[in-house]
């Protein structure tokens, strides 16, 4: 009996030391390597770019990853993910809506030849009926992979589902390969193309009346008053769509992919970081550094999370996806999310995946173009890693 007790307490002490060492390792390296003092020398004149660069260089980045082992990845992710969800406002939604039951309503259904196309609304909050298009492959049996395709900035919220407002829009959509949900259903996936919060029917009444394509600024301002963010709202919507799909559709829960372009790439990256049910994240024309993209040039207000650099860079947030699959699609001529900055961020992301023991589970695809979707990179990655 005494021997069993000694063995038990020895094992417990050993495991406690491992966790403590991992946690202390994070705290020590982050404190020593990340915290930086600001340059206190007086400057003769004001330069906005120099001022912001100084702020970015002195950002705390308390959750910037510095580990080297899978155990350190686990400890870091557990703490960072909770903090990120709190900062985005997702934790608040989880607390306030703990007993809320999502509801969905089918609006119409039609056979479009290659698929069944249905329009739905889903109540992701009591006051938020969110429109989405559901594409179902025909003549498929058993559980199927699911792809959710959040869109970016534009007037039409149904482009990804292959629904266009004009012939010119159709041409531009096909050139930019924006029919992401159509690509998915044609490859045997169940596809959901949701309206992004702040667009379409979820705009303000004033913006609808003036035909303003989106209400992102208003959404951000109102969210900030209650500790929420548009990114958090949109990630919440993705999670509620997953809840509904798993309950109502023949979905293979081991193959849930999220992929969108630009603002849809933002939602994709953050959703993969926050919701571990997502097995693969493929953001297009978004993955970069915060400082080299939204911190350097004009971007829509919905891109911003207060104090995000207190936590880390975009590569750290993407690292919360590890060891699950992650592929970023970037255009070599994208001026909004410059390739040079994306490559810099990817070096850091690769270190996280290497520490997690799965360096091949993340890829950077460089497309020969600008700010658009790159289906070749997406589907090469999917076909390589889709769990059969």
Region locations from a protein language model:
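N-terminal targeting or regulatory segments adjacent to alpha/beta-hydrolase or S9 domains
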Residues: 22-116, 124
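Alpha/beta-hydrolase fold nucleophile elbow
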Residues: 250-261
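C-terminal catalytic histidine-bearing segment of alpha/beta-hydrolase fold enzymes
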Residues: 347-388
């Amino acid at each position: 009996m005494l021997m069993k007790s000694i063995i038990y307490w020895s094992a417990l002490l050993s495991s406690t030391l491992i966790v403590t060492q991992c946690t202390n390792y994070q705290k020590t390296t982050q404190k020593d390597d990340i915290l930086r003092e600001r340059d206190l020398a007086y400057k003769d004149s004001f330069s906005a770019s120099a001022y912001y660069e100084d702020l970015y260089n002195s950002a705390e980045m308390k959750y910037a990853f510095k580990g080297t082992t899978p155990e350190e990845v686990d400890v870091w992710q557990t703490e960072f993910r909770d903090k990120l969800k709190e900062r985005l406002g997702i934790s608040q939604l989880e607390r306030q809506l703990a007993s809320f039951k999502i509801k969905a309503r089918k609006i119409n259904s039609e056979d479009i030849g290659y698929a069944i196309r249905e329009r739905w609304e889903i109540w992701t909050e009591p006051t938020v009926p969110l429109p989405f298009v559901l594409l179902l492959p025909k003549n498929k049996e058993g559980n199927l992979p699911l792809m959710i395709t959040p869109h970016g900035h534009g007037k039409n919220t149904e482009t990804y589902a292959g629904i266009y407002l004009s012939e010119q829009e159709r041409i531009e959509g096909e050139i930019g390969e924006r029919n992401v949900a159509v690509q998915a259903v044609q490859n045997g996936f169940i596809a959901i193309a949701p309206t992004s919060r702040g667009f379409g029917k979820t705009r303000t009444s004033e913006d609808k009346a003036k035909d303003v394509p989106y209400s992102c600024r208003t959404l951000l301002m109102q969210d900030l008053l209650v500790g929420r963010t548009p990114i958090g709202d949109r990630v919440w919507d993705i999670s509620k769509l997953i809840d509904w799909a798993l309950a109502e559709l023949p979905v293979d829960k081991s193959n849930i992919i999220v992929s969108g372009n630009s603002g849809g790439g933002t939602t994709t990256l953050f959703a993969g970081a926050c919701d571990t049910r997502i097995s693969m994240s493929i953001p297009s024309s978004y993955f970069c550094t915060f400082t080299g993209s939204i911190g350097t040039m004009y971007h829509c207000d919905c891109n911003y999370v207060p104090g995000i650099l207190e936590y880390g860079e975009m590569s750290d947030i993407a690292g919360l996806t590890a060891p699950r699959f992650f592929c970023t699609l970037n255009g070599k001529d994208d001026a909004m999310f410059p390739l040079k900055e994306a490559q810099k961020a990817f070096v850091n992301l690769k270190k996280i995946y290497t520490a997690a023991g799965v360096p091949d589970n993340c890829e950077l695809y460089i497309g020969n173009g600008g700010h658009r979707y790159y289906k070749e990179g997406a589907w090469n990655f999917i076909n390589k890693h889709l769990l059969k």
